[in-house]
Amino acid sequence: MALVLDAEVVLLDIEGTIASQSFVLDVLFGYSRARMADFVAARRGDPEIEAILADVAARAGGTDPVAALLAWQDADQKIPPLKKLQGRIWESGYKEGAYVSHIYDDALIALRRFKAAGLPLYIFSSGSVQAQIQYFQFSSAGDLRSLFDGHFDTDIGAKVEAASYQAIADTIGARPSRIVFFSDNPRELEAAAAAGIVVVHVVKGNTPSDPRFPEITDFSTVELRHSKTE
């Protein structure tokens, strides 16, 4: 049975929603963990790296910055300096051909369908904007950057806070009720719904169902009707 919604803008999470959570956790996180210390040591003096380390030091007190970064990654903390450094490390892996990013086939078909219908597509992820762009540039389906109209990371606010979604709506220039947000995370859906955004729970793999939200297991069951408001 199709889920039919009116929409002006599409907002999407990445991990667990349009891409495999295991790719991010096993491949990308594994790559950055194994290389973090050497990557930082080889780039001391790089202004961006030094700014990241200063931010880490301010947050971690007397803890060694690399040790703090590794601990944050192991705990899957969504901390901005960690996300920025991960993006830099992952960029080197993409460019060296160490891996290509994953995207679900059904999600990619739907994204192209939404785009062809005139719906702008935006990403909201805890990964840095830089890391998001790289993810879609080096995908298993080729360079997908042209699909997206913009990217948001936690610089705009936490993904579990309603104010973040209101800020995104304000930035895009769309009424929250005209935005449809897809995510696998109920806490994110709660926050978006509190801001007045239409939400859809994406249930892939081992993601548990949640009866509070409209739910899909395959993007082919979603029909978005593009109805621009004045």
UniProtKB/Swiss-Prot annotation:
<dbReference type="InterPro" id="IPR036412">
    <property type="entry name" value="HAD-like_sf"/>
</dbReference>
<dbReference type="GO" id="GO:0000287">
    <property type="term" value="F:magnesium ion binding"/>
</dbReference>
<comment type="similarity">
    <text>Belongs to the HAD-like hydrolase superfamily. MasA/MtnC family.</text>
</comment>
<keyword id="KW-0460">Magnesium</keyword>
<dbReference type="GO" id="GO:0043716">
    <property type="term" value="F:2-hydroxy-3-keto-5-methylthiopentenyl-1-phosphate phosphatase activity"/>
</dbReference>
<comment type="function">
    <text>Bifunctional enzyme that catalyzes the enolization of 2,3-diketo-5-methylthiopentyl-1-phosphate (DK-MTP-1-P) into the intermediate 2-hydroxy-3-keto-5-methylthiopentenyl-1-phosphate (HK-MTPenyl-1-P), which is then dephosphorylated to form the acireductone 1,2-dihydroxy-3-keto-5-methylthiopentene (DHK-MTPene).</text>
</comment>
<dbReference type="GO" id="GO:0019509">
    <property type="term" value="P:L-methionine salvage from methylthioadenosine"/>
</dbReference>
<comment type="pathway">
    <text>Amino-acid biosynthesis; L-methionine biosynthesis via salvage pathway; L-methionine from S-methyl-5-thio-alpha-D-ribose 1-phosphate: step 3/6.</text>
</comment>
<keyword id="KW-0378">Hydrolase</keyword>
<dbReference type="InterPro" id="IPR006439">
    <property type="entry name" value="HAD-SF_hydro_IA"/>
</dbReference>
<keyword id="KW-0028">Amino-acid biosynthesis</keyword>
<dbReference type="GO" id="GO:0043874">
    <property type="term" value="F:acireductone synthase activity"/>
</dbReference>
<protein>
    <recommendedName>
        <fullName>Enolase-phosphatase E1</fullName>
        <ecNumber>3.1.3.77</ecNumber>
    </recommendedName>
</protein>
<dbReference type="InterPro" id="IPR023214">
    <property type="entry name" value="HAD_sf"/>
</dbReference>
<dbReference type="Pfam" id="PF00702">
    <property type="entry name" value="Hydrolase"/>
</dbReference>
<dbReference type="InterPro" id="IPR023943">
    <property type="entry name" value="Enolase-ppase_E1"/>
</dbReference>
<comment type="pathway">
    <text>Amino-acid biosynthesis; L-methionine biosynthesis via salvage pathway; L-methionine from S-methyl-5-thio-alpha-D-ribose 1-phosphate: step 4/6.</text>
</comment>
<comment type="subunit">
    <text>Monomer.</text>
</comment>
<keyword id="KW-0479">Metal-binding</keyword>
<dbReference type="GO" id="GO:0043715">
    <property type="term" value="F:2,3-diketo-5-methylthiopentyl-1-phosphate enolase activity"/>
</dbReference>
<keyword id="KW-0486">Methionine biosynthesis</keyword>
